[in-house]
């Protein structure tokens, strides 16, 4: 891991712990412990497996993009690089995952300007897919339609704008006239060439379908959490409702641009569950369980992947120069 990111990751971990503590106080700590006792922990490994399936499908999207851009790499190293970036899951909008580009550069000299657009394309298709997962539930649940529609329109419009080659090349030509940017124009052209190839209709549709499937696995994990608790609450939550609540909460957490959506996602999950009349302690327990099984599990997977990558490649990632911004 990188020294300059260690403090950020540690800060996010502390912030996450404090948020869990605050929610524990909100739910009444003793009642929260009772809720955890009600949960059948034999289902927890299954929820982790579903989260990992999310990672596998997202990796397939990464591989699909990598092949479109003709970036040569063995599947094994590509998988380790992909998972290593999960340590950056607690950076705003997950954009710290551009770490993948720096590792690719170390492996085969691929310019960051060529591969970094993959991260942008990943985020675009993630947003579009989550909107797709949420949209039906929003109208059934009668909540959040406006936010979801706005986010959907914004990201679809952004994708269409990126695919408007003439306009984008004209914009880049304007950058050439700005003195301190003119020296980077070649990189801008390289980056645009990559992102343009990734957002064409066929790659966009394929990547979005992969994203829908991958994020549905985590929605399914949340559904299992709620149904394990149903014996204690006597409230059956449909898969459609669970998908909406998890997807919507993930969406606004990402929009907030806070590290890992910390605080915002948890508040949304808990609040929406309480709208369903699920007791406060069960709502908070469900939120903590799914966040540990998704966000924090991803960070742990990323840490192990970084360790394995360093040992296999004999590279010290501390020595890789990366920008200070996540």
PLM features per residue range, with description:
Residues 190-191, 257-260, 270-289:
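Hydrophobic alpha-helical transmembrane segments in multi-pass integral membrane proteins
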Residues 1-82, 140, 144-253, 295-326:
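Predominantly cytoplasmic-facing regulatory/coupling regions of multi-pass membrane proteins
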Residues 95-107, 256-275:
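Re-entrant/interfacial helical elements at transmembrane boundaries that shape
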Residues 87-92, 114-138, 252, 289-300:
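Membrane-embedded alpha-helical segments of transport systems
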């Amino acid at each position: 891991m990188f020294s300059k990111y260690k403090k950020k990751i540690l800060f996010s971990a502390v912030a996450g712990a404090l948020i869990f503590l605050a929610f524990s106080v909100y739910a009444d700590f003793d009642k929260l412990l009772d809720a955890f006792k009600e949960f059948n922990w034999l289902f927890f490994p299954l929820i982790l497996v579903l989260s990992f399936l999310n990672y596998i499908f997202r990796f397939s999207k990464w591989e699909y993009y990598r092949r479109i851009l003709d970036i040569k790499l063995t599947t094994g190293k590509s998988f380790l690089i992909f998972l290593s970036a999960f340590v950056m899951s607690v950076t705003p909008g997950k954009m710290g995952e551009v770490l993948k580009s720096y590792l690719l550069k170390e492996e085969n000299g691929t310019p960051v300007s060529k591969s970094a657009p993959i991260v942008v394309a990943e985020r675009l298709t993630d947003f579009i897919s989550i909107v797709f997962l949420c949209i039906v539930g929003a109208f059934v649940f009668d909540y959040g339609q406006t936010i979801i529609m706005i986010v959907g329109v914004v990201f679809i419009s952004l994708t269409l704008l990126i695919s408007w080659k003439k306009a984008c090349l004209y914009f880049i030509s304007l950058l050439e006239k700005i003195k301190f940017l003119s020296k980077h124009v070649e990189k801008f052209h390289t980056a645009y060439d990559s992102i343009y190839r990734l957002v064409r209709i066929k790659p966009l549709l394929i990547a979005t379908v992969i994203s829908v499937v991958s994020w549905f696995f985590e929605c399914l994990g949340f559904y299992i959490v709620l149904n394990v608790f149903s014996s204690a609450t006597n409230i059956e939550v449909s898969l459609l409702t669970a998908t909406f609540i998890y997807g919507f909460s993930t969406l606004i957490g990402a929009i907030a641009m806070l590290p890992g959506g910390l605080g915002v996602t948890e508040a949304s999950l808990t609040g929406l569950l309480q709208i369903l009349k699920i007791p406060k302690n069960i709502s908070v327990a469900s939120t903590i369980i799914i966040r540990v099984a998704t966000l924090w599990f991803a960070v742990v997977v990323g840490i192990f992947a970084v360790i394995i990558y360093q040992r296999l490649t004999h590279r010290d990632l501390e020595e890789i120069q990366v920008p200070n911004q996540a």
